[in-house]
């Protein structure tokens, strides 16, 4: 898939205010500072479609982007160590879970994992929650360019082993680098394949 157009549509904190559309949606979510904004900009070929920040927890709203006029890319708030108050975190969690439970247009969630780190409990718990609620998801390993190939392979293998303790099989996953554009075609082709089948 080639991205010809990518337009910001709306930001909001309530699922009921999301676009009144039947277009398929693909949600991107992960721990704070996982490289989500950089990945979205890489996928769309736009340098500043999603705002990047060195400060974790910058994305605090549900952001919809219209891609090629036929699907929505949804940028969700990061979870984890976002530098926000506990009460704000609860609000995040509430509308994130509401989005996944209520938004029928949501076809697949892409859970971003920093490939440099060992499996994190918060990531495992979130994916477990998705599974328990029958929400389709894939894993995107980010920042692959920061590691030597052998270490990258080892880290991903660790994740596979961890996942297979609770899951029958490893979910679909992609290895990416916003710097080298590694994984760009694979993810976009995956989305295109789903769009063509629905």
UniProtKB/Swiss-Prot annotation:
Family: Belongs to the TRAFAC class TrmE-Era-EngA-EngB-Septin-like GTPase superfamily. EngB GTPase family.
Organism listed in the record: Christiangramia forsetii (strain DSM 17595 / CGMCC 1.15422 / KT0803)
Binding-site positions, Mg(2+): 37, 59
PANTHER family xref list: ENGB-TYPE G DOMAIN-CONTAINING PROTEIN, MSS1/TRME-RELATED GTP-BINDING PROTEIN
Record lineage: Bacteria, Pseudomonadati, Bacteroidota, Flavobacteriia, Flavobacteriales
Known function: Necessary for normal cell division and for the maintenance of normal septation.
Residues bound to GTP: 30-37, 57-61, 75-78, 142-145, 175-178
GO biological process, one term: division septum assembly
InterPro entries: G_ENGB_dom, GTP-bd, GTP-bd_ribosome_bio_YsxC, P-loop_NTPase
Keyword annotations from UniProtKB, A to Z: Cell cycle, Cell division, GTP-binding, Magnesium, Metal-binding, Nucleotide-binding, Septation
Name the record gives this protein: Probable GTP-binding protein EngB
Cysteine disulfide partners in this protein: none
Domain of life the protein comes from: Bacteria
Cofactors demanded by this protein: Mg(2+)
Domain EngB-type G, residue spans: 22-197
């Amino acid at each position: 898939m080639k991205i010809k157009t990518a337009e910001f549509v709306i930001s909001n904190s309530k699922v009921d205010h999301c676009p009144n559309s039947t277009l398929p949606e693909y949600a991107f979510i992960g721990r704070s500072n996982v490289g989500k904004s950089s990945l979205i900009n890489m996928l769309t070929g736009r340098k500043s479609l999603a705002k990047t920040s060195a400060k974790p927890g910058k994305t605090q709203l549900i952001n919809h982007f219209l891609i090629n006029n036929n699907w929505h890319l949804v940028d969700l708030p990061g979870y984890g160590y976002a530098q926000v108050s506990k009460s704000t975190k609860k609000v995040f969690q509430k509308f994130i879970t509401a989005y996944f439970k209520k938004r029928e247009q949501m076809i697949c969630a892409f859970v971003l994992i920093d490939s440099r780190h060992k499996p994190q409990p918060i990531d495992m718990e979130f994916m477990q929650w998705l599974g328990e609620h029958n929400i389709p998801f894939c894993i995107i390993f980010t920042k692959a360019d920061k590691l030597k190939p052998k270490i990258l392979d080892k880290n991903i293998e660790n994740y596979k082993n961890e996942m297979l303790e609770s899951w029958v099989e490893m979910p679909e996953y992609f290895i990416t680098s916003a710097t080298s554009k590694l994984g760009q075609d694979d993810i976009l082709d995956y989305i295109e394949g789903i769009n063509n089948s629905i």
